[in-house]
Each structure stands twice: as C-alpha cells, then as structure tokens.
Regions:
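ACP-dependent fatty acid/polyketide chain-elongation machinery
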Residues: 1-70, 92, 267-279, 374-388, ...
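Active-site-adjacent elements of ketosynthase-type condensing enzymes
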Residues: 47, 51-57, 136, 215-242, ...
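Conserved catalytic cysteine-centered active-site region
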Residues: 2-7, 41-89, 122, 132-195, ...
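Flexible, low-complexity linker/loop segments at domain and module junctions
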Residues: 1-12, 106-119, 313-319, 350, ...
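Short, well-ordered amphipathic alpha-helical segments that serve as non-catalytic structural scaffolds
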Residues: 81-92, 165, 192, 265, ...
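Phosphate/pyrophosphate-binding loops at sites that engage ATP/ADP/AMP, CoA/4′-phosphopantetheine
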Residues: 88-119, 269-276, 305-322, 344-348
C-alpha cells in the first residue's frame, strides 16, 4: 500500500487474556462482571519480611499449560504473552501461521474457516512490557551467586530481554511486517496497541498481534514499590486493598498476566468474512515532562492525550459512553484523571460509565493496557460496563453518577469506549474504540 494513501480503518477481530481473574478471556470477563478480586495474601517465605505481602498472581500458572520445552526457554512475562496471543489468534479465526494458506483465505478443509493471513510480511507483532524478564534476571543471579557461573542458563539473555515477548509472539504467527516492543512503564501495553493500530492505518501491515504483558511479583519489586509508598499495605484485606475512588485508597495491588488483541484492516477482515468486535479508532499520546514517578497534578498531559485522539480521529465527545480508567487506587492519580477528562469533555462526561477494573485485577504495570483493552472491547461487545469494587465511601471529588459497584448497561447505537493508561516517566495514552449499531 502507498503510504500516502488515506488512512485505513482498523478493527478488532480477536481477544486473548490470562489474568489474576482467569486463564482465558471468558473466565476473566465473567469474574469482572461478578466483581471478583484476584488479590490474595502471599504465602511464600520471602514475603514475611516485606512491607507489602499481598498481590494478584495469575489464576493459571503458564507452565501448567505450555509445553515444558517451550516454558523452560521463556521468561514468565513471555509465557503470559504467548498464551494470550494464542487465544486471540484462534479467536480471530486463524488456525495456522501466516503464509500457511498459500495465498488463499480458505482453510481448505471444507468448513470455510480461515487458516491464516496469506502473506507473513503483512503481519506484525507489538507487545509492551514495563520491566521485561526480571524473574529470569533475579533467578539466574541467584544461580550465579549460589552455584557458580557454569550453572547459569545459556538462555538467560534471550529470556530477560524486554523484546522477548514480542519476538516469541511474532514467531508464533510468523509475523514479518515488524516485531516491536514498547517500554513505557505502565502505559506500555496500551501504547503497543496504539502502535499496532498505526501500523495498519498507514499500510505497513494488514494484521497485528498487539498487547501487553508483565510478571514482576518478586521480592525486589514488592519492596521497592512498597518503599515508594505506591502500593497498598492492607495486608489483612487483600481483596479489599485495591479501591479506586474510595476515600481510604492507599495504593495499588501488583498483578501479573497479559492481554492481547488481533488488530486487522477492515477490508482484510471483510474479505475473509471475519467476525468483528469493534473498530479500533486510534490513539492519543502525550508526555508530562514533570517527574519520573509522580503524576503531573493538573492532569494537563492526560487532557492533551484525549484532545489529540479527538483531533486525529472522527470520534465525537457525545459518542463516548464508557471509560476503562487507569485508576490505580492512588490518592492523587484517580481524581486527577477524571478531572482532566472533564476539562476536555465538559457536559459529555456526565454520560460516561467509568470502570476501574484494577479494583479486581490489580495493576499489571506494562500488561495493564493489554488486559484493560480486552475488557474495553468486551464491554462494547456486550454493551456492559464492568463494576468498580471496594468503594466503601466515595471520594468527595468524584461524581457518583460516573462509577458504580454493579455492571451497567451501555446504550445502543454507535458508541465509543476509551481506555486510559499512564506510566512512570509521564507517558499518557488514550485509546478509542467504537461499536456500531447492530454489532
């Protein structure tokens, strides 16, 4: 495609997830609607001396699902990414790697199923991670210290590389249009999906596997975040610890897992008769340039990202019916985000159903934008906004009409949902998705 051609429409044709709420998309969505928390008290011996002794580990251990020979060569973050990508790829109707069709859109088995995209050079992989293979780095350092250099795994370097998840996902589907890694702290997964959207809009690819992954529930991270006063210390109440918008919120709960979507050019999806979840309209980006670990207090960067999304797409503020908020359960960030959006949307903010799904999943850092995009896409598909749990006493600065402890129906017709992700370093990402009447 000529890069000077008009921007193409992008749609979502597959979703995949492995999260603290379930080992796949269906179980995760069911738990979100039921208002279940994936947080738990850590039982490992090393947790006893930490200031934070709670987390939201993945519901399904990836090593129990992946073949042993593969699992041993992947860091936990890459394991999550591969599992989520496999589910999303199959959900999109693909049954093989790119290029295995020999140029045909028919699987050739008489069912009419789609085998895979015909040209691997039109398929991309973009996976974000905030930290990368830290579990491998720490465990292999222990091996070096305790058993000597000859016992260090020869797979250590490829396992700990931050680009490893994207590379392995790319090899899973034979993606050759480009394999990219976004490392923007807690905005990584969302920015990766935005990058994938742009790859298709500008003609670089027809199909992109995009998302985010993280696996950092280890003593060093828990101690470091705890000492930063960023995490909840409600060690006696793990499931009630993540409480966005509640007056008593005191920080996030660390989670792990991955969320992946299949992005596809609309004409490519139509040609193969693919089922479409929604349109992936675009992204807005900005940077705070304020502090490496503190949010800019006025929310100007958040507002700028939303303004960019509105300026570069055909989204109208009146269409926006749902927001999956970044809302990590920190005292400052939750309210700043809502105020920034209100500045841009004005009265249209009043009909936005806000969901803070981190109240259930915990905060997956670089994986957050991935699983929250999956939740946003499913909210549009089912026209239902998930609840926000653990609000005992709503913050006085939060409009009570915006959030609910129960699932809420979304209106019919053409509606837009936003997914916000912000990261240390001042990274701001706002993704926009649209479902049309009849979808």
């Amino acid at each position: 495609m000529n890069l000077n051609s008009p921007l193409r429409t992008v749609v979502v044709t597959g979703v995949g997830a492995t999260t603290p709420l379930g080992g796949d998309t269906a179980s995760t969505w069911e738990s979100l609607l039921a208002g279940r928390s994936g947080a738990t008290a850590l039982q490992q011996d090393w947790a006893a001396e930490l200031p934070v002794r709670i987390a939201a580990p993945a519901a399904v251990d990836p090593t129990s699902v992946l073949p042993g020979h593969l699992a041993r060569r992947l860091d936990r973050a890459a394991q999550f990414a591969v599992l989520a990508a496999r589910e999303a790829w199959a959900d999109a109707g693909f049954t093989g790697k790119a290029g295995e069709t020999g140029g045909s859109f028919d699987a050739g088995d008489g069912t009419g199923r789609i085998s895979a995209p015909a040209d691997p050079y039109r398929v991309g992989s973009v996976v974000g991670t905030g930290v990368g293979g830290v579990t491998t780095l720490l465990s292999q350092y222990d091996v070096l210290r305790e058993r000597g250099s000859r016992k260090v795994s020869p797979y250590t370097v490829p396992m700990l590389m931050p680009n490893s998840p994207a590379a392995h996902v790319g090899m899973e589907v034979d993606a050759r249009a480009g394999v990219h890694t976004v490392v923007s702290a807690c905005a990584s997964g969302a920015e990766a999906i935005g990058y994938g959207i742009d790859m298709i809009r500008t003609g670089r690819a027809d199909v992109v596997v995009a998302g985010g992954t993280e696996a950092v529930i280890v003593p060093l991270n828990l101690a470091a975040f705890g000492n930063m006063m960023a995490m909840s210390k409600r060690n006696d109440d793990p499931q009630g610890a993540s409480r966005p918008y509640d007056k008593g919120r005191d920080g996030f709960v660390l989670g792990e897992g991955a969320g992946v979507v299949i992005l596809e050019a609309a004409e490519h999806a139509a040609r193969r008769g693919a089922a479409v979840y929604c349109e992936a309209v675009g992204q807005g980006l900005s940077a705070d340039s304020y502090h490496i670990a503190q949010p800019e207090p006025t929310g100007r960067g958040i507002a700028a990202a939303l303004e960019q999304l509105l300026a570069t797409t055909d989204i109208r503020p009146s269409e926006i019916a749902h927001l999956n908020a970044h809302a990590t359960s920190t005292p400052q960030g939750d309210v700043t985000e809502l105020k920034a959006l209100e500045k841009v949307l004005g009265d249209d903010m009043g009909h936005v159903a806000v969901s803070a799904t981190k109240s259930m999943t915990g905060h997956l850092l670089g994986g957050a934008g991935g699983i929250e995009t999956v939740a946003t896409v499913l909210a549009l598909r089912h026209r239902t906004a998930p609840p926000t749990i653990n609000i005992t006493e709503l913050d006085d600065e939060v409009d009570p009409s915006l959030v609910s402890s129960r699932p809420r129906p979304l209106p019919g017709g053409n509606i837009v949902a936003l997914n916000n992700s912000f990261g240390f370093g001042g990274h701001n990402v706002v993704l926009g998705f649209r479902v049309t009447d009849g979808q």
